[in-house]
Amino acid sequence: MGFAFLSNLLMRPLMNYRHVAGDAGNEVIPDLAARMPEISQDGLTYEFTLRRGVRFGPPLDREVTSRDVAYALERVATPSLGARYGFYFMSAIEGMSDYASGQASSISGIETPDDDTIVFHLLQPTGDFLKRLAMPAAAPIPEEVGGCFTEPGYGRYLVATGPYMIKGSDSIGTECDDLEPAAGFAPNRRLTLVRNPNFDFSTDDPTIRSARFQRYELTVESDISKIYRRAEAGTIDIAPGGPGLDVIRRYTSRASLRNNLHVESGDRLWYISMNLTQPPFDDVHVRRAANFVMDKDFLVRTWGGSLQGSVATHVLPDDMLDGALEGFDPYRSRHHAGDVRRAAQEMRLSRYDRNDDGLCDADACRDVVHVARSSPPWSEMTGIIESSLRKIGIELDTRPNDDAYSVIQKVPNDIPITSAPGWVKDYPDPFSFIGFLFDGRNIRKPANTNYAMVGLTEELAEDLRIPAPDPPVPSIDAGIDRCAATLPSRERTKCWAELDKSLMTKVVPWIPYLAANKLVITSDAISPYEFDQFSGEISFAHIGIDRSL
């Protein structure tokens, strides 16, 4: 949701998207940039000219310069501020890692020869670099306000460049000692956006944002049933979260509600992750057996069946590969219900099957810690996962947690298996799936997303102060680098497709089970309706409201 508000309404990065559904919504186009960049023949230099007349909103009133873009990326490279997004840029821009580590006082690969020009020098050709620059993290930030924050917290003081701003932004102030957070943003409670008076529509591309509303009000509500009761009553206009089975049944069975349920391709995947450093999942044959035996059909039905998506059989959403892996299923079973016979055959090859009976019968196969979410549908999946793995001798010790991510993202916790994760692309390219989730160089002690620990080396383990993997775990870092350097083409698609196949057959870090749709519920008054393929949310940039409906 944050990506949607930032890219649709609040911020103007160099590049952006049209915020519509389908392939057209995945095409990157200039926003703050006046035109597409000049790219050197070797693909290592990108030169952008900024659009004139784009101004920061209150409390500032000045034109955006190239230095504001460079400063935003300096923040991305600052470990205390960059969240997870630094990886996308430090792996691409020359000198960014040196800046992040404190070895350099500036980023050598970013030049701002004048206020209207910014030049990037890359470490290697990067086929999706324009899409990385379209992420909100790369949108301009004014140093006079952003520089007041050496730790996270700037979000409540965000200075807008888009058509909307946070209510109360005009009262933030510009002196670090006197800053007051914008009244319209109360984290985890509410967000109110109003028109940015400094936004000039003549500087904008109307295909990016229509900006039809005068005001947006977002309320955070933990009672899911209350959200959908209010949506049905028409007292709220958008319910973008995941509706439960009872809500889905009402909206699909009642003619008066049917048109208000929108089913979109969400470019997202739900999966079970196995930690390659923890027994018994440190044996690839156990991981393959777990894939063979899992009843994916039952798992998908707990989510609500085909309306929620289709059974996933590999890592990347099919739309990202132009269908190159449609039909690829290395662990095929009848109706996706699991194949105990083939699972047992695979288990017999494992060192954890000591009796050669197709069962995991070593001590490591008992009381295997499984971290799950405590709310539906994950809580309803637990019995299916336990029952499936019990067929190959693995007994789980399931530990439900309201905040499962806080547990599994801490590397020292050594969680062997978790059914909590899902992933939605950060931008429409396979690098934002495979590159981000499986690059060993992106394993971090806090906020780790490579739960399987693919690519963990002895050196990295030492840096993280965790035991070195024994036996060593496989790495796909070289394959990621090869695919990332390939320019957009059939060859790039083929490269990622082959790497996906290798992940699922040789590395086997996941049991993917649901290639998920995005379900959005709206009131009758939302007209026109549009979906934003980039953010995977309703298109706040283009929807309108008609109270006569």
Language-model-detected regions and their locations in the chain:
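Extracellular/periplasmic solute-recognition and catalytic clefts
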Residues: 167-173, 180-194, 204, 217-278, ...
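Long beta-strand-rich cores associated with HINT superfamily self-processing modules
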Residues: 520-549
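Aromatic- and charge-enriched surface segment that lines or borders ligand/interaction sites
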Residues: 35-88, 119, 230, 280-283, ...
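Structural transition elements
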Residues: 307-355, 372-380
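Surface-exposed binding/hinge segments that line
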Residues: 47-49, 64-68, 75-148, 152-157, ...
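Gly/Pro-rich hinge or "lid" segments in bacterial periplasmic/extracellular proteins
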Residues: 18-20, 104-106, 125-215, 225-226, ...
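Extracytoplasmic/peripheral linker and loop segments enriched in polar/acidic and small residues
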Residues: 288, 300-303, 309, 334-341, ...
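N-terminal lobe/hinge region of extracytoplasmic solute-binding protein
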Residues: 1-41, 159-161, 165
